[in-house]
Swiss-Prot record:
It is found in: Nucleus, Nucleolus; Cytoplasm. GO terms for molecular function: DNA binding; preribosome binding; zinc ion binding. A zinc finger (C2H2-type) spans 61-85. This is Zinc finger protein 593. Residues 26-36 have a biased composition (Basic and acidic residues). Residues 1-25 have a biased composition (Basic residues). Involved in pre-60S ribosomal particles maturation by promoting the nuclear export of the 60S ribosome. Negatively modulates the DNA binding activity of Oct-2 and therefore its transcriptional regulatory activity. Keywords: Cytoplasm, DNA-binding, Metal-binding, Nucleus, Ribosome biogenesis, Transcription, Transcription regulation, Zinc, Zinc-finger. Transmembrane segments: none annotated. SMART domains: ZnF_U1 (SM00451). InterPro entries: C2H2-ZF_Maturation_Protein, Matrin/U1-like-C_Znf_C2H2, Znf_C2H2_jaz, Znf_C2H2_sf, Znf_C2H2_type. The keyword Protein biosynthesis does not apply.
Length: 134
């Protein structure tokens, strides 16, 4: 018996690459730009707005720090207590890497330690529930 040819083996990872690119989350500096008060804020969903059918929960319950959508507010609140969310808040508390810091690292200045930034713990675009108790 001879050796079998592995035809098409060079295309084996193309689907995995597509899925990896599809699930890619925004980088920390992009999230910092969103969370800054002077940055352009992402518009909050209106209560009477039409939900986006492509996003979980219609895109109404989003954690800005983790850039994730959730199906309802209960899952969003559970996420706020999770280890992944707390780890992301710790990553966001460090000032993002800047051009000035890169120049200092290249020898064009003295080292300045990155500042710690205050990040709100519950950062979401959740629509508050209407009070119907009266």
């Amino acid at each position: 018996m001879g050796r079998s040819r592995r035809t098409g083996a060079h295309r084996a990872h193309s689907l995995a690459r597509q899925m990896k690119a599809k699930k890619r989350r925004p980088d920390l500096d992009e999230i910092h730009r969103e969370l800054r008060p002077q940055g352009l804020p992402r518009p909050k969903p209106e209560p009477d707005a039409e939900p986006d059918p492509d996003l979980p929960g219609g895109g109404l319950h989003r954690c800005l720090a983790c850039a994730r959508y959730f199906i309802d507010s209960a899952n969003l609140k559970t996420h706020f207590r999770s280890k992944d969310h707390k780890k992301r808040l710790k990553q966001l508390s460090v000032e993002p890497y800047s051009q000035e810091e890169a120049e200092r690292a290249a020898g064009m200045g003295s080292y300045v330690q990155p500042q710690r930034l205050g990040v709100p713990t519950e950062v979401s675009t959740d629509i508050p529930e209407m009070d119907t108790s009266t």
